[in-house]
Every structure is written in structure tokens, then in C-alpha cells.
């Protein structure tokens, strides 16, 4: 019995010490030190490192739960801010064409593609009104970004290439050199409708 215990403990110690010699001086090797992009599986990020904007892409539940009482600099406490927000003006439209949320992403836009730019909103309204006048167009939803105009069209008849060309021609007059894309996809129409009405 004593020999078995001695042999078992010797094997265990040998197996444990084997890993110590596998990568000599690995602590000083900085070629593979794990500096990967954070992917959001943790909640210990310090929002102050990102100028307090609260956008660290941890995920919805983590964003709700982290930093609950850290001096009003979190995403959940939007009524108690310590600085002026980026856009506290009256909403641009009250007819449901555009969203009325002025305080999206606290003070900065996490993905600033130009969609929430007021000039782009006005331009989208002009394009939507003009495209609605095109023959065979019953309804339209328009999204304008800094480099693109996306138009979703609803029609009760088959939408031909000629109809599409007429929509592009009508929109190009307002597009200011932006790429104009026209779609009859119902899913895109619903998505743009939700985007414009949030």
C-alpha cells in the first residue's frame, strides 16, 4: 500500500511539474499577450474611460445592470445628467415621420452614419413627399445617410423597371450626389417605417 501511494504521488508531482518547463521565459514573451478587442462578456468596464458616453457595447442586460450608482454617468439614468446633451431642441417633425428621441446614446452617437443629422431628416422628408407623387407609388419610406438614400416603395401593382427609374430620377433631384437605392421589399419598408417612427 505504501508503494502505491508513493508511486501515485510521484506521478502526480511529475505531471504537475511537467507544465512548468513547457514554455521557458513565457512571461517576457509579448508576441501573444492576448490583446484582443473586448467582446462584451463582462461588466467591469469603466465608462469614464470613454468620456462617460455609456456606449461600451456590453449587451443589453449588462448595460442595464453595470455601474448603477456611479455618479449619474450610466445609460440607465438619463434624467439626471451632468452636462448638456447634444440635441435638446424641439423635435423636427410631429407627424410621425421621424423619431422624437433627442437623447439617443447619451451625448454621442455610437454609430454616427448621418441618419440622425437634422439636414438628412429634412432631405428624407422632401424625397418621400416627391416620390409619393410618382405614378404607381402608394407609399414610401426614406432613409438618408451621409452617402446614401434608401427608398422603400409600396405599390399595389407590379413595380416595373420604368417605375423604379422614375423613382430614382425623382429622388436624384434632391440626393445631392448620394447613391440612390430603391426597393419594393416589404421587410425593408417595415424596417424603415419602424426606424422613422421610433
Swiss-Prot record:
Residues 95-115 have a biased composition (Low complexity). Residues 91-115 are annotated as: Disordered. It comes from the Bacteria. GO terms for cellular component: endospore cortex. Pfam families: Spore_YhcN_YlaJ (PF09580). It is found in: Spore cortex. InterPro entries: Spore_lipoprot_YhcN/YlaJ-like. Induction: Transcribed by SigG at time T3 of sporulation. Residues 1-21 form the signal peptide. The keyword Glycoprotein does not apply. One of its GO terms (biological process) is sporulation resulting in formation of a cellular spore. Keywords: Signal, Sporulation. Present in spore but not in vegetative cell. This is Sporulation cortex protein CoxA. It comes from Bacillus subtilis (strain 168). The gene is coxA.
Amino acid at each position: 500500500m505504501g508503494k502505491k501511494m508513493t508511486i501515485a504521488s510521484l506521478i502526480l508531482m511529475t505531471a504537475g511539474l511537467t507544465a512548468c518547463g513547457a514554455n521557458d521565459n513565457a512571461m517576457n514573451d509579448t508576441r501573444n499577450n492576448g490583446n484582443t478587442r473586448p467582446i462584451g462578456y463582462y461588466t467591469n468596464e469603466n465608462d469614464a474611460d470613454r468620456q462617460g458616453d455609456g456606449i461600451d457595447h456590453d449587451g443589453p442586460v449588462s448595460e442595464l445592470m453595470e455601474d448603477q450608482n456611479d455618479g449619474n454617468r450610466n445609460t440607465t439614468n438619463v434624467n439626471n445628467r451632468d452636462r448638456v446633451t447634444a440635441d435638446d431642441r424641439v423635435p423636427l417633425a410631429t407627424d410621425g415621420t421621424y423619431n422624437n428621441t433627442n437623447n439617443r446614446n447619451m451625448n454621442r452617437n455610437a454609430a454616427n452614419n448621418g441618419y440622425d443629422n437634422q439636414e438628412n431628416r429634412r432631405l428624407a422628408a422632401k424625397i418621400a413627399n416627391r416620390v409619393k407623387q410618382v405614378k404607381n407609388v402608394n407609399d414610401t419610406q426614406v432613409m438618408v445617410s451621409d452617402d446614401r438614400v434608401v427608398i422603400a416603395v409600396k405599390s399595389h401593382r407590379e413595380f416595373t423597371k420604368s417605375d423604379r427609374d422614375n423613382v430614382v430620377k425623382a429622388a436624384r433631384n434632391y440626393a445631392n450626389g448620394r447613391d440612390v437605392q430603391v426597393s419594393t421589399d416589404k421587410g425593408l419598408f417595415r424596417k424603415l417605417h419602424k426606424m422613422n417612427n421610433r
